[in-house]
Amino acid sequence: MPLQGVDTQHFLDTCWQRKTTVLRAALADFVCPIDGDDLAGLACEEDVDSRLIVQEGQEWLLRHGPFGDADFGELPADKWTLLVQSVDQWIPEIASLLADFRFIPRWRIDDIMVSYASHGGSVGPHFDQY
């Protein structure tokens, strides 16, 4: 499934590693094979790298997995996000997404991280180290 409405050469020439870019509807035909419960299940596994970020007022709380069912039951109704790294290693349908990004050198792609956020959920101010 090619990226829809994306000129990959233009993206590489003007956007890649230069500016934040949102590719809306680029994967319009993609049907996600997992839901929030599936992602939470992965986050309970010992070998899966996962994080929960919860906003409490002006503070951001970070917790690292693995998590238990009780951890999800104790979450507030809103303002939290679950992040799970390397989902492509666990869900083949997610791994198939990498084919759509073959125009990016493979050595530049680490993994596919999947997030699930409640209403108002975010990762807060942060920077990524790769």
Model region roles, listed by residue range:
Residues 20:
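Short hydrophobic/aromatic beta-strand or adjacent loop that forms the aromatic wall/cage
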Residues 1-6, 10-14, 28-32, 40-130:
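Active-site region of the double-stranded beta-helix
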